[in-house]
């Protein structure tokens, strides 16, 4: 299905207008072509194969393709959140041979114009990045918050054995003698999530800049956003329901194209207490590795000062492999003009 580009296009860079880009809404039939141009993207941790079909069905989301001479060369997804005031840009990818030519910028401008025509109340564009932000980026974007990215890998069977060696079979907190809490982390049901995040201000001091980040998606704690989040397979955890100082969201594991039998586990941590973070990390690992077989890439996002001690904990205590050194996840936004 073609989109009427007459309502959208700002002036194209001359080279691109001559190259002749066409834009269309993505369909199921485009999947194989999209995957073919997405090889090796995101270090093999591409979530799109798992999410593509559901993305096409989300009423508040538009997935746009750019074609050149009939071939898909770029994709971008835009999801309208925050009561219709924010467009969240996700999934950007450009075919290797077309990178560095300005395609991504043109596609983003196209998507912005399209969303503005459909949702005139949209005020802000928001996206999450893991590359180094430079002066030009800060001319375009405001930094909302940033988290340290800790990426480790392990075989599920090996980690299960290691957890049993650490005597974590039943009582995780008793195995962490330095823990600042004697009570185990609490997994929240939907009622408790609503109460904590929407009807009290208890999470204000825990969430980074009042932002719930779930697997690269930043949301404000609003009922409309919570309706989106609660449809997903996520474990929500806090250290204390009455007075939380540490919270985490663990997205259920899904397959990624690193190789056969590779899974991705995403854990978003909020708060500044290392011991409580370790407790919740272990609880998530224990819960989700029990049924997994094969290799797991586990990516944790946490307050930057916690990165180094948590990396040491992963290496020395859990004997899992650190995949890369410190990098940052940055949530940025700009006004829609």
From Swiss-Prot:
Propeptide span(s): 1-2
Keywords, alphabetical: Acyltransferase, Transferase
Coiled coil: none
Enzyme class: transferase
Molecular functions per Gene Ontology: L-histidine N-acetyltransferase activity
Domain N-acetyltransferase: start-end pairs: 21-156
Catalytic function, reaction form: L-histidine + acetyl-CoA = N(alpha)-acetyl-L-histidine + CoA + H(+)
Domain of life: Eukaryota
Protein EC: 2.3.1.33
Signal peptide: none
Cross-referenced PANTHER family: LOC100145250 PROTEIN (PTHR47403), N-ACETYLTRANSFERASE 16-RELATED (PTHR47403:SF3)
Role according to the record: Enzyme responsible for the N-acetyl-histidine (NAH) synthesis, which is a major constituent of brain and lens of ectothermic vertebrates.
Additional record remark: Strong histidine N-acetyltransferase activity has been detected in ectothermic vertebrates and not in endothermic birds and mammals.
Protein name: Histidine N-acetyltransferase
């Amino acid at each position: 299905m073609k989109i009427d580009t007459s309502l959208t296009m700002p002036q194209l860079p001359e080279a691109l207008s001559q190259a002749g880009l066409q834009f269309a809404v993505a369909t199921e039939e485009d999947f194989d072509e999209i995957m073919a141009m997405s090889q090796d993207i995101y270090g093999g941790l591409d979530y799109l194969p798992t999410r593509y079909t559901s993305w096409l069905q989300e009423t508040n989301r538009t997935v746009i393709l750019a074609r050149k001479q009939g071939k898909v060369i770029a994709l971008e997804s835009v999801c309208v959140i925050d009561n219709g005031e924010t467009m969240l840009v996700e999934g950007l990818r450009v075919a290797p041979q077309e990178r560095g030519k300005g395609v991504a910028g043109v596609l983003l401008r196209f998507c912005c114009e399209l969303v503005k025509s459909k949702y005139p109340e949209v005020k802000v564009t928001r996206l999450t990045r893991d590359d180094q932000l430079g002066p030009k980026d800060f001319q375009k974007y405001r930094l909302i918050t940033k988290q340290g990215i800790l990426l480790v890998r392990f075989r599920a069977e090996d980690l299960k054995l290691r957890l049993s060696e650490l005597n974590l079979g039943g009582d995780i907190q008793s195995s962490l003698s330095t823990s600042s809490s004697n009570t185990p982390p609490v997994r929240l049901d939907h009622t408790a999530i609503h109460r904590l995040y929407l009807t009290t201000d208890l999470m204000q001091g825990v969430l980074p800049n009042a932002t719930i980040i779930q697997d690269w998606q930043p949301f404000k704690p609003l009922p409309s956003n919570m309706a989106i989040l609660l449809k997903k397979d996520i474990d929500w955890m806090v250290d204390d329901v009455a007075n939380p100082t540490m919270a985490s969201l663990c997205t259920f594991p899904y397959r990624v194209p690193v190789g056969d039998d590779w899974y991705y586990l995403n854990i978003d941590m909020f708060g500044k207490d290392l011991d409580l973070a370790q407790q919740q990390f272990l609880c998530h690992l224990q819960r989700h590795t029990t049924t997994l077989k094969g290799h797991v890439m586990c990516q944790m996002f946490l307050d930057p000062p916690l990165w180094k001690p948590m990396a040491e904990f992963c290496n020395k205590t859990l004997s899992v492999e650190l995949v890369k050194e410190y990098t940052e996840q940055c949530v940025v936004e700009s006004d829609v003009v």
